[in-house]
Amino acid sequence: MATLIRSKLSNVATSVSNKSQAKVSGMFARMGFQAATDEEALGFAHCDDLDTEHRQGLQMDILKTEVPTGDAPPEGDIHYQRDGTGLPPSASKDEGLCSELSSSEKPQITAWEAGWNVTNAIQGMFVLGLPYAILHGGYLGLFLIIFAAVVCCYTGKILIACLYEENEDGETVRVRDSYVDIANACCAPRFPKLGGRVVNVAQIIELVMTCILYVVVSGNLMYNSFPNLPISQKSWSIMATAVLLPCAFLKNLKAVSKFSLLCTVAHFVINILVIAYCLSRARDWAWDKVKFYIDVKKFPISIGIIVFSYTSQIFLPSLEGNMQSPREFHCMMNWTHIAACILKGLFALVAYLTWADETKEVITDNLPSTIRAVVNLFLVSKALLSYPLPFFAAVEVLEKSLFQEGARAFFPNCYGGDGRLKSWGLTLRCALVVFTLLMAIYVPHFALLMGLTGSLTGAGLCFLLPSLFHLKLMWRQLLWHQVFFDVSIFVIGSICSVSGFVHSLEGLIEAYAYNIED
């Protein structure tokens, strides 16, 4: 009996010794030393397999996706998709070469072209609401224009940093492709799809609200341009939507991209006309009207307006991935946001000094009737030409989330086998256009809607989520001041988001209760 016990104890001790030697050998092997014996090498291989299973096994539920028959991609070419499915890119040299070749076939853009895209996003027509923000914020509103530029530039950079990780060789490689991938990585392994769904919902809300704002501003501008005509603002919005209804038939953005230059030209013409008129009245500028105190009830709305005018984080991952030199991304973000900060600050201040307490939600409504009609026609043209971009993006997110996820889709595919859109899918697109019209008719308040959207989704996508994801994914690599910045942005963003949302909602309820048209 004693011999049997000694034998078992000896076997257990030998097993434990072998495992410990294998772990030590594995650790040394990672540090560059070779294993001493074949047994230790075998133990290290086993430990490495266990380590791989430990790191990847928790995500097996999102890796088990069905690859459709037919054009099945090769194993080395499968990447993380928008919803977080698919295998992560391999670290092998052959597959890395394949990915480089495939990426080289894509049209690459320069840092200047990327900066132009960011500038178009953050220098859009929504800057027309910034003088209204100065009305309720005074000098603090000007400070917030600068502060929001700094924070949005920083959060854009850390959002891109979340796309990368260090491999075993210490090299930084891109392992994620989109905002949704980052969100899914943060919520894995317990809720591998929750983060992506939250980001998708926020994106859809922001894109649809942007479409609604375009319809609202079109109806508002046309009504104020021709006040003598017996046509109400709602009727102008209906006519604008009738022009926009063909957007439901869009298959891609090739037909829309040619109008982007016209949008930019129209925007510069509008800014030049407004600033030229303001400069012509420089002698009457009311410097004494710029307050150092704030309207506690209205100022949170101003925060939402300012934040919404800087939103660009949605498309930054795709933009950075298509740059010829991604290392220039940080420099591009710096000069685009510096330029935006200067131009927005000057535009808002000059416009407010001209009209002071009479500043309206859309600053062009303050212009004389003769100039206003010309400027507003340019604005309406820009709004109508800009509508297809967020509309198509919202449709794409909805289709991929609800109709094109294979076995996980909530509804059947809205495209037929020949790639054509089914009739009921077209009906849903038309319904989305009509929905933007109904919202514009029943909530025709440009600044309040802009503040509501900026406080809800703008602050979330630009402030809260990037800082939270940065802390979650890169906690071990962050320095103390980076942690401080992220936590501060998250706390301040949360306070501004909640207060702005509540006060914007109160403003909408008040405007609706008192039947305020503008």
From Swiss-Prot:
Membrane topology according to the record: Multi-pass membrane protein
Keyword Transport: yes
Cellular component GO terms, alphabetical: cell projection; cytoplasmic vesicle membrane; presynapse; synaptic vesicle; vacuolar membrane
Top-rank lineage group of the source organism: Eukaryota
Entry annotated with the keyword Transmembrane helix: yes
Keyword field: Cell projection, Cytoplasmic vesicle, Membrane, Neurotransmitter transport, Synapse, Transmembrane, Transmembrane helix, Transport
GO terms for MF: gamma-aminobutyric acid transmembrane transporter activity; gamma-aminobutyric acid:proton antiporter activity; glycine transmembrane transporter activity; glycine:proton antiporter activity; L-amino acid transmembrane transporter activity
Catalytic activity: 4-aminobutanoate(out) + n H(+)(in) = 4-aminobutanoate(in) + n H(+)(out); glycine(out) + n H(+)(in) = glycine(in) + n H(+)(out); beta-alanine(out) + n H(+)(in) = beta-alanine(in) + n H(+)(out)
Parts of the chain on the Cytoplasmic side: 1-125, 219-258, 320-334, 398-431, 476-482
Transmembrane segments: 126-146, 198-218, 259-279, 299-319, 335-355, 377-397, 432-452, 455-475, 483-503
Primary location class: membrane
InterPro entries: AA_transpt_TM (IPR013057)
Expressing tissues: Initially expressed in late neurula stages in the anterior spinal cord. By early tailbud stages, expression extends posteriorly along the entire developing spinal cord and appears in the hindbrain. In late tailbud embryos, expressed in the forebrain, midbrain, hindbrain, spinal cord and retina. In swimming tadpoles, expressed in an extended and more intense pattern including interneurons.
Residue intervals on the Lumenal, vesicle side: 147-197, 280-298, 356-376, 453-454, 504-518
GO biological process, any: glycine transport
Places the protein is found: Cytoplasmic vesicle membrane; Presynapse
Pfam families reported in the protein's UniProt record: Aa_trans
Role this protein plays: Antiporter that exchanges vesicular protons for cytosolic 4-aminobutanoate or to a lesser extend glycine, thus allowing their secretion from nerve terminals. The transport is equally dependent on the chemical and electrical components of the proton gradient. May also transport beta-alanine. Acidification of GABAergic synaptic vesicles is a prerequisite for 4-aminobutanoate uptake.
PANTHER family, per the entry: AMINO ACID TRANSPORTER, VESICULAR INHIBITORY AMINO ACID TRANSPORTER
Family: Belongs to the amino acid/polyamine transporter 2 family.
UniProt-recorded name of the protein: Vesicular inhibitory amino acid transporter
Record organism: Xenopus laevis (African clawed frog)
Gene from which the chain derives: slc32a1
